[in-house]
């Protein structure tokens, strides 16, 4: 089973690891949790090899990468 690492970015800083997920439902839950907490500006998902899968601006909901 593939795993994906979820990172948060605050104030344009470095990626901060938040959690690791293995399916879309867990990824959506992490996204919703991070959005509600309001601490991070961006959510970034990377695959097991470190490749960027997506990035969203949590304030606007726009996909940025």
Give, region by region, the residue ranges found by the protein language model.
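Short aromatic-glycine-(Arg/Gly/Cys) micro-motifs in beta-strand/loop hairpins
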Residues: 1-17
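Surface-exposed loop/edge segments in extracytoplasmic proteins
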Residues: 13-19, 51-55
């Amino acid at each position: 089973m593939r795993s994906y690492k979820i990172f948060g970015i605050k104030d344009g800083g470095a990626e901060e690891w938040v959690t690791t997920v293995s399916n879309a439902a867990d990824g959506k839950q992490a996204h919703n949790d991070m959005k509600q907490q309001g601490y991070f500006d961006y959510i970034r998902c990377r695959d097991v090899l470190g490749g960027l899968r997506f990035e969203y601006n949590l304030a606007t909901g726009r996909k940025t990468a």
